[in-house]
Curated annotation (Swiss-Prot):
GO cellular component term of the entry, any: ribosome
GO molecular function, one term: structural constituent of ribosome
One BP annotation, GO: translation
Organism: Marchantia polymorpha (Common liverwort)
InterPro entries listed in its UniProt record: Ribosomal_uS11, Ribosomal_uS11_CS, Ribosomal_uS11_sf
Name recorded for this polypeptide: Small ribosomal subunit protein uS11m
Coiled-coil regions, chain positions: none
């Protein structure tokens, strides 16, 4: 691996993929190592409308579409960061794998409250 301007050849083929899986949609964003967005895909942009956007099949199709574009951009290896509690978490990983990308690392970055908000006062009747 030769270094040229501080970036190795391995980093040119490596990208970071953010999967945001909500109960209504799945959004996949591909960035390079500097955090610059290269491409994105969502269930709505693939062609699913309404309640079909929140299905496992829609998440897998979205991931396959994002993987296809990533390979065209020259990326081969993927570091995945998953955020959210939606239905498309596992199926989007399967879609990235079926799309031809090699997954090197998987991290769950879902925010969890340490104590949360204060609950409302008890109701006095």
């Amino acid at each position: 691996m030769q270094k040229k301007h501080g970036i190795t050849n391995m980093q040119k083929k490596h990208c970071i993929t953010y999967i945001q899986s909500t109960f209504g949609n799945t959004i996949i964003t591909l960035t390079d190592y500097n955090g610059n967005t290269k491409t994105w895909s969502s269930s709505g942009s693939v062609g699913f409308k309404g309640s079909r956007r929140s299905t496992n099949y829609a998440a897998q199709a979205t991931a396959e579409n994002a993987a296809r574009v990533a390979i065209q951009l020259g990326f081969k290896f993927v570091e995945v960061r998953i955020k959210g509690l939606g239905y498309g978490k596992e199926s989007s990983l399967r879609g990235l794998k079926l799309g031809g990308l090699i997954i090197t690392k998987i991290r769950d970055v879902t925010p969890t409250p340490h104590n949360g908000c204060r609950p409302p006062k008890k109701r006095r009747v």
